[in-house]
Structure formats: C-alpha cells, structure tokens
Amino acid sequence: RDAQESRGLGDVYKRQLYHSMIAPTIYNDVDGAYYGPDKKVHQADGWVNYSTFSLWDTYRAAHPLFTYTEPERVNDMIKSFIAFYEQNNRLPVWNFYGSETDMMIGYHAVPVIADAYLKGIGDFDAEKALNACVATANLDSYRGIGLYKELGYIPYNVTDHYNAENWSLSKTLEYAFDDYCIAEMAKKMGKQDIADTFYKRSRNYRNLYNPETSFMQPRDDKGRFIKGFKADDYTPHICESNGWQYFWSVQHDIDGLIDLVGGKNRFAEKLDSMFTYHPAADAELPLFSTGMIGQYAHGNEPSHHVIYLFNSIGFNERTQYYVAKVMNELYKNEPAGLCGNEDCGQMSAWYVFSAMGFYPVNPVSGKYEIGTPLFPEMQLHLTNGKTFTVLAPNVNKKNIYIQSTKVNGHPYDKTYITHEQIMSGATVEFEMGSTPKTIGVIFEEKRP
C-alpha cells in the first residue's frame, strides 16, 4: 500500500483496537471491595473484579482477542464470573454494575471460560469454573432450559417471565453452542461423563432444522413446525435477526450443518444466497439490521462469522472478497465510523482480527479461519515474549486475494491458523493478487 493509504487504514485500525477495549469494566474499589448481585459487599482479594459483560456479543471475537492482548485480565474476568455465580447461583449473561440485566440470551460466560481453560490461561479454579458452567446450563427454571433439556429445543408457544419476546429458536441454537463448550472443557479435564452429556446436547440445533424449507424453524411443544414461516421475516422467535441470519449459528459443528442441508454443493448455494438475496426495496428493516449485504447484517453479531464459512466448502476467494468489502466499506475513521452498535467491543474486535487476516469462527476451537490481511506487515507482541508476524507485502485495495501462504517459510495449504502457531511466534506470509485463486481443500461438486 502507498504511505497515505496505509496511514488512513492505520487510523481506522487504531480506532477499532481502542473500541475493542471499552468493556468489560473494573468493578471494585481501590481496596478490592464491591457490591455483588446478592446485594452484599464482597472482597476481591488478589484479583480485579470486572463487570459490564455483554456476552452474547463479545464471546465471539472480543474475548478471544483478549487472550492475546491481555491474558492476565482474562484470568481476572474468569474469577469475576466464578464470584458472580457464587453470589447469584448462575453465571452472568449481561451483567452491569454487579447486577444481572438478563438483556440477552445464552449462557455465554461458558465459551469465555472454556476458551481460557483450553488455552491454559491463568490460575482460576477450573473445578469451580466447570461446576458453575454445568449448574448454569442445568437451571431448569431459567429461560426455557428445562424444556430444552426435555424436548431438545425450546418450543415457541411456551413463554417465560424473563422476556416478552420468546426468542425460542435463537435460545436453542445458543444453548447448543454453549453446551459444546462445556463438553470441550470437561473432556480436557478428564470428565468424560459430563462431556458425553453436553456433546449430545450440543446437537440439539438439528431438532429445529426443517428439511422442507431448509431453514431452522420454530417448533411448538408438540413438535410441529410453525406455519407460515418466512426466512426473511423478523419475528419474536428469533433474537434481533431473521431466519437467514440465525441459520448459521452452529459455529461448533459446521460440518454437521453442511450434512444437514444435503452436502457441500447445497450449502454453497445457500451461503451464496445469503449475500445475494436482498431485502425488498420497501422492506422496513429493524434498527439492528445494518451493514447489509443481501441478508448478511454486519451491524449485528449473529452474522459476524458467516463470511468465513466459505472456507469450509472450498470457496476461500468469496471469504476474501466479502471480508475486504466489509473492512473497506463499513469501518471508517469518523464519529459514526461503524455500521452498527459497538456492543461493548465486539464490532471492533471483528475488524481487529480480520485486519490481521483471520477470525475465530468457533471461538473455543483454537482455530482461526483465514480471510484477507489489510496491511503489508502486522506484529502481535505476546506476553510470553514472542512475536507473531503477518506479512502481505503486495496487499492493496485491488490485491485482496491470497495466491499462496507460507508459515515460517514453508508452504501452507490449510484454511486456518492455530492458537499454537500464534503463541509460538510464527511468521505467516501471504502472496496477494488481484484475481482469485482458491487454496486449501477444494471439492469437486459443481459450483453455484
């Protein structure tokens, strides 16, 4: 890139890096005292207590980013979760100033805990952390969990007192992902019985798939799919999204989702349609559907990983195209420089990762799907004293397509890099070009 272009993009990057750190916030006095969710004063002894966890948003990229930029704080965040559980009988969902708002859904403290544990971060009590995860996931009275366990999904015709909007479909998918995270942590800890239980629960997303419509679809307590379903409608059954946008919320089992729809070719057609099926010109979109590319809504979190799913079916060049498009068009160095709500750092964390050339589709997998880098050189200085480097000497606004990849000087054909490669201080070098050249595993089916 020329110097002027690099300076401009550098300003945008620094802006997003700053924004990614606006939450969570320290929530204790200088002596460690803080007011807990049980309305009592507690003491953070030897650690810092944090609050303002917008976890439905930030588990996706912001918290994985913290594991590299500030792992010592991640340790204290997990300790904050454990303390919150001990004082409130469940992990935080969206806590603010020490109180639970229950503003969003899922039990997404779980993936943050699991990611930290699987990466070996900190000295938090893993037994206490896992127990808190399991207890929260088994709290039958909370937001449909009892029905989720009984039926394998949350029925749309049964509501609870937590939320006037049912969001049944979204809860089912979010719970399934969180259950996978519990299983991964339990497996690592040698607790196979817990792992088996939650791996089974993590497949509950399949119970909402309707092969007749090829979408996830709300079901009632008798097992019947809702009538009159339209995937581009925004309804009370789907959280801040429509059927197109939430269909892909199976980050833990993309291969299973591919099989569910009938194979890679069908999946490719559906994924391509996600970006090319545009809302009607007179459609009144909700305020959170911003940054639209077809049905893809970059202004809201459920879409954030979807761009990177082309890698899983051999269409890497489409991931590269759309990632570059979003970075160049939807992030700007101006007061209204985002296409949606910052959401406590998640919107910017997407950019911080993507500008480095990769993104955590599954935030607890230790794998980062390759997109397209933004700068000729980026370095990540790690707390273990090593430096992870990304090189793309000839990248510019036209040269957005990866022609070849090397890791530590050796040819590399995978569609992702790993946590271990990052922490080892590896050097990843991309040769960029202006025309697509698909890398990695390519299937032989007809392309849409």
Q: Locations of the language-model features?
A:
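Single conserved hydrophobic/aromatic residue that forms the stacking wall/gate
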Residues: 2-9, 13
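N-terminal core-entry segment
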Residues: 14-58, 62, 69-140
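Structured loops at beta-to-helix junctions and adjacent beta-edge loops in soluble globular domains
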Residues: 19, 23, 116, 355, ...
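Active-site core of glycosidic bond-cleaving carbohydrate-active enzymes
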Residues: 45-60, 68-69, 110, 120-389, ...
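Short strand-turn-strand beta-turns centered on an Asx-Gly dipeptide
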Residues: 383, 407-410
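Beta-strand-rich binding/interaction modules
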Residues: 398-404
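Short, solvent-exposed S/T- and G/P-enriched segments that are highly enriched in secreted/extracellular
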Residues: 413-418
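C-terminal beta-strand-rich structural cap/linker in extracellular carbohydrate-active enzymes
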Residues: 419-448
